[in-house]
Amino acid sequence: MNARRKKRLALATALIGGVAAIASLLLYALNSNLNLFYTPTEIVHGKKDTGVKPEIGQRIRVGGMVTVGSLVRDPESLHVEFAVHDAAGGEVMVTYDDLLPDLFREGQGIVAQGVLIEGGKLEATEVLAKHDENYMPPEVAEAMGQTHEKLEYDSTQKTGY
């Protein structure tokens, strides 16, 4: 092989290697920023199609209804814990260390975004609540199958305390 062909081969090899390295770094960056939506049942039992569960430490969003009677507030801080369930019976505990949205109530649809820290526990970085009694995020509405029942609230539940 002459010198000219060796240079071309080295250049082509370096170019292919560089493109492969850039592609792998790009895919890694995209994978670490993915924020997949799961229902509580999918977190506990895995996806219906594949049975795949989210991994511990994975950033996810979970949507469902806040279980009535599950809200526990720490009187000394902003820390709250509550359970989120869906129509299929799955339930996930959510912990959150910030102010909850004004419209957050037990029995209401929410979407919590955060990191899965145990099999059935999410450490939320953001909690989103619906903005009126008829609205529900599309993912939650689909996951719940619109089978939830409207709850009647007493005065303490309406104030959130």
UniProtKB/Swiss-Prot annotation:
Residues assigned to the Periplasmic compartment are: 30-161
Membrane disposition: Single-pass type II membrane protein
Q: What is this protein called?
A: Cytochrome c-type biogenesis protein CcmE
Q: Does the keyword Transmembrane apply?
A: yes
Q: Which family does it belong to?
A: Belongs to the CcmE/CycJ family.
Q: Which GO terms describe its cellular component?
A: plasma membrane
Q: Record keywords: Cytoplasm included?
A: no
Stretches assigned to the Cytoplasmic side = 1-8
